Design a protein with these regions (language model features):
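Compact, charge-rich alpha-helical regulatory domains located at protein termini
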Residues: 1-36
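Conserved PLP-enzyme active-site core in the AAT-like
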Residues: 2, 14, 135-306, 372, ...
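Gly-rich Lys/Arg/Thr-decorated short loops/hinges at beta-loop-alpha junctions or inter-strand turns
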Residues: 88-100, 116-123, 148-149, 171-181, ...
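Active-site C-terminal subdomain of aminotransferase-like
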Residues: 266-371, 375-378
Length: 463
């Protein structure tokens, strides 16, 4: 196939075949009033001139900011091994590994991704990846609807708003609905409201969806919420932040049937909100309901270890109306980045990342309290906290001029909540390298310690 541009002789030959005397005649059907009069393109540049112009544009980017921005997308140190691995030509491809005999490397990396995420969340079945945390959460809701044959989903108001809206889009129909659960003064989900909603005999619930930590950074009573959901015959879905699982209990430990989350913190740099990788895991009882791809390990005819795609319940493989998902792709390269990141850090390294972010958040809270800035919510948190700052938008802009990215304005997500009108959500990670003046961390608010590595069912232990 020739990729060279058409020559003038080529164009004249095609126009002659069409019976036209100019290219402009091809657009005669477009009314002149809406037709472009011409393209105001700059003069051609040499490669050197173009590089200099792009460098000048790139120099306008602010990369020297002290950032407290999180709200679902987080800046972490990314080991050099991550880019080294994902840049290899064997992996940087759009090819789907349908032919296992020539795709063992790609299939093995997906299997390793599934194994590592299974160990992290404490659930045995993990999909090969999804677009992002929002679509993974929405798919979890549909899994629950199919498994329970119920038509109502309850989701906490404190789940990330992107996940809430994606789930609403997926779930809502004339026969199904999504209801939001309110939050308490401490920022956690109102379990009394949850219990009342579950007790409604007219609207049996398929799933209860709660985030850990939630969108305010608050730690939720997940075990109790799971207990209430199961008592009413509903499934419990935990929406998790993966780095936090190095120090918090995994979803499988407190009874979650499904875990969803966004894998961006695992070795993927923030870039205008993407790319990312959706995490979705479930119990063995729900294995047939999980959408997307699964990679399994088997043996070939010669008895050698082999990796293959298995249990493919996608619309490309079975009848569309029976398919578990109509998503026809995944985020394999981003999943490989997450795999490399986790393998490089190991459980204790990941625990250090989570614990450092938590310690920095407590130092930030103490420093802000010293100048009269208080938290919005009183609940326990890990490394993200909401604070009240009168005139938050103006303060945010003023600090940005001074090289400080002062978090996320929660009023953008909750415009009708007066408590959040002047609230900034501040996040700390190990890259919060310019901390406020240090104060002793009170003993009643200790920084979490990394939890001991756990081995999920069907997964190999990692060192």
């Amino acid at each position: 196939m020739v990729y060279g541009p058409h020559t003038q002789a080529d164009r004249e030959r095609m126009l002659a075949t069409l019976g036209l005397d100019s290219v402009e005649r091809l657009f005669d059907d477009i009314p002149p009033a809406v037709r472009a009069a011409g393209l105001d393109l700059p003069a051609p540049r040499s490669e050197l001139e173009l590089v200099r112009e792009l460098q000048a544009l790139a120099a306008r980017n602010r990369v020297d900011l002290v950032s407290f921005l999180g709200a679902g997308v987080y800046r972490h140190h990314i080991p050099a091994s991550v880019d080294a691995v994902i840049s290899r030509g064997e992996f940087a491809t759009a090819y789907t590994p349908y032919q296992p005999e020539i795709s063992q490397g790609t299939l093995q990396t997906v299997f390793e991704f599934q194994s590592l995420i299974a160990e992290l969340v404490g659930l045995p079945v993990v999909s090969a990846s999804h677009y992002d945390g929002a679509t993974a959460t929405a798919e979890a809701a549909l899994m629950a609807v199919r498994a329970t044959r119920r038509q109502r989903v309850l989701i906490s108001r404190a789940v990330h708003r992107h996940a809430v809206e994606a789930t609403r889009t997926y779930v809502t129909s004339p026969s199904r609905d999504l209801a939001e659960l309110p939050t308490l003064e401490d920022g956690s989900t109102d379990l009394a409201a949850l219990e009342a909603a579950l007790a409604d005999p007219e609207h049996p619930v398929a799933a209860v969806i709660i985030g850990q930590p939630n969108a305010f950074g608050i730690l939720e009573p997940m075990a109790r919420a799971a207990e209430l959901a199961h008592a009413a015959g509903a499934l419990f879905v935990a929406v998790v932040e993966p780095v936090s699982l190095a120090v918090l209990a995994p979803p499988g430990e407190y009874g979650a049937d499904i875990a969803a989350g966004d894998g961006q913190p695992l070795g993927i740099a923030p870039a205008y909100g993407g790319p990312s990788v959706g995490l979705l895991a479930c119990s063995e009882a729900l294995m047939r309901q999980i959408p997307g791809r699964l990679v399994g390990r088997t043996t070939d005819l010669d008895g050698r270890r082999a990796f293959v795609m298995t249990l493919r319940a996608r619309e490309q493989d079975i009848r569309r109306d029976k398919a578990a998902s109509n998503i026809c792709t995944n985020q394999a390269l981003c999943a490989l980045a997450a795999t490399t990141y986790l393998a490089t850090l190991g459980p204790h390294g990941l625990g250090d990342v989570a614990a450092t972010g938590a310690a920095m958040a407590r130092r930030l809270e103490d420093a802000l309290a010293g100048i009269g800035v208080q938290r919005v919510h009183g609940g326990a948190y890990l490394s993200e906290l909401a604070v009240t700052v009168p005139g938050a938008r103006d303060v945010h802009g003023a600090l940005l001029e001074r090289g400080i990215l002062a978090g996320f304005e929660l009023a953008r997500w909750y415009p009708d909540d007066p408590r959040l009108r002047d609230a900034l959500l501040l996040s700390c990670t190990e890259l919060t390298t310019t901390p406020p003046p240090r104060r002793p961390i009170p003993s009643e608010r200790p920084c979490p310690s990394p939890r001991a590595p756990r081995r999920a069912a069907g997964c190999r232990r990692r060192s």
